[in-house]
Amino acid sequence: MDIETSGAIRLFFPNPSLTLVYFEALANALDAGATEVSIDIDVQAFDKPDTLKITVSDNGDGFTDENFERFRKLLRPRDKFHKGIGRLVFLNYFSRVEVTSTRDKWRRNFIFKDGFDGNAPLEILTDEQPAKTALVFNGFAKDRVKSYDDLKPDALKPLLIEQFLPTLDARKRDGKAFKISVNLKTSESNAQKEFFPHETAITPDDLPSMTKITIQDDSLDAISTIDMYYYIESVAGKGSSLI
């Protein structure tokens, strides 16, 4: 890797959150054109963080040569809307991320960790494979998980919708189906904290109904009209919130 990762983590993410791991992994999947994404959270018990394993899999384009080169050159963004540093948060919470990406007649395997050398050549396969990329997060690097909500599917669902609403709503308006599944597997439940094996999913039907307004300004050179989508959400104890 072309940057010292441990120092970069402290520089770019002084106050990270475990939810950023989900956000970054899902962002990568959506950027790769995935229509089906699964976030599988496996932990023996909430108070046994060393057993935590998270697997994020999708049916997107995967680690093609272009995508892998961008990943290897850590600070090279996809475009002006991406900073190119998000995946650093992976190593703030996990010591290693095992990556397997297959598509057509190729497969690429590598382990993303501190000191990653950027070497992951394509393996040519005999038979054609369906597109699938899986990131397996192992070696939880913290003493504890801060909140049950960091692992509970029903708590993560609204956060994911809020974070990716513009992208998901655009897909919905274009008639493109998608499904994002969040699954928790644990052998030691906590009924008081509503912590137990559970699965939920995000589909177009889960998105709020957006209102469209068109802003027109003939003085603009390239674009005279801009479409803006918004919705107003009631927030308990706080009135309404414009999103």
Label every PLM stretch briefly.
Residues 61-62:
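Glycine-rich G1-box
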Residues 35-39, 52, 97:
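Conserved beta-strand core positions
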Residues 1-34, 38, 42-43, 65-72:
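Bergerat-fold GHKL ATPase/HATPase_c domain
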Residues 43-54:
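Short beta-strand-loop-beta element adjacent to the nucleotide/active-site pocket used for signaling
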